[in-house]
């Protein structure tokens, strides 16, 4: 790879600036390991030194084309998801629904924790997905968990993960939903069913952006947005002592 008036690494940078997903195969007579490493760091898909034997180049080209095809397919599917979960696709024309959609549209442009309250079957998860796919985190994962669907003993380990040997049957370490949602959004459905101990741990995570897996002592940093939902009036739950007041006010920050 020889480019007049421009170094090969600068040339690679220019290509990646024009199309970050375009796979680039560098074919060169330079067998320097340092140059190969630098080229890969700048985004080269493969680095082939001349003279090469057999089908090494054609194999690299086939792999590059497959990667390009997957990247294009992923981009298409993501656009389909974003289009499907556009706020305009949520059915409803009552003043209350329109007000909710306007608020959801506003909050999607922020990174605030969100609490969605509504009866069963009113589309709370659909609103949560629309918020995610219209936010700056849409390129990250959207992970969901129904707090009412798991026993209390399992919910904590499912959310925060655990280390090997943390409890009977924990024969390997496992990431929790918070870690899996890192860089994206975690949707906590039916949060009213979460016990006070787990609520306290969620509160700490929201404030410190870190967690410890069950049975572990290592602190894990997480960057995750939390969207909560419930078909119960959490304000009433707080008054009755059935939900932690500090956790409620930390998740109910918008509007």
Predicted regions located by residue number:
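Short amphipathic alpha-helix used as the core "switch/output" element in two-component signaling
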Residues: 2-4, 9-21, 38
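The feature encodes the CheY-like receiver
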Residues: 4, 28, 32, 194-195
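A Lys-centered signature of the CheY-like receiver
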Residues: 42, 50, 93
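Conserved post-Walker A coupling segment in P-loop NTPases
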Residues: 52, 89, 103-168, 179-195
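Flexible nucleotide-interacting loop at or near the entrance of a catalytic core
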Residues: 56-119
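Conserved AAA+/SF3 P-loop NTPase catalytic/coupling segment centered on the Walker-B
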Residues: 152-157, 178-207, 224, 228, ...
């Amino acid at each position: 790879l020889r480019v007049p008036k421009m170094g090969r690494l600068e040339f690679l940078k220019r290509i990646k600036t024009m199309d970050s997903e375009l796979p680039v195969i560098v074919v060169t007579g330079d067998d320097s390991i340092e140059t190969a490493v630098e080229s890969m760091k700048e985004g080269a898909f493969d680095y082939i030194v001349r003279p090469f034997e057999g089908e090494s180049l054609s194999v690299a080209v086939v792999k590059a084309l497959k990667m390009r095809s997957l990247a294009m397919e992923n981009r298409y599917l993501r656009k389909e998801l974003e289009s499907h979960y556009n706020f305009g696709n949520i059915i409803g024309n009552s003043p209350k629904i329109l007000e909710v959609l306007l608020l959801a549209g506003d909050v999607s442009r922020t990174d605030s924790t969100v609490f969605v309250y509504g009866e069963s079957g009113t589309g709370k998860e659909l609103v949560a997905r629309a918020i995610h796919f219209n936010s700056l985190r849409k390129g990250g994962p959207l992970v969901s968990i129904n707090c009412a669907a798991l026993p209390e003993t399992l919910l904590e380990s499912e959310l925060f993960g655990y280390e090997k040997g943390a409890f009977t049957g924990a024969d390997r370490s496992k990431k929790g939903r918070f870690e899996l949602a890192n860089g994206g959004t975690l949707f906590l459905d039916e949060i009213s069913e979460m016990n006070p101990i787990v609520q306290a741990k969620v509160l700490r995570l929201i404030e410190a952006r870190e967690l410890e897996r069950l049975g572990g002592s290592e602190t894990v940093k997480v960057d995750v947005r939390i969207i909560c939902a419930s078909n119960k009036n959490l304000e009433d739950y707080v008054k009755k002592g059935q939900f932690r007041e500090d956790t409620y006010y930390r998740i109910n920050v918008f509007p």
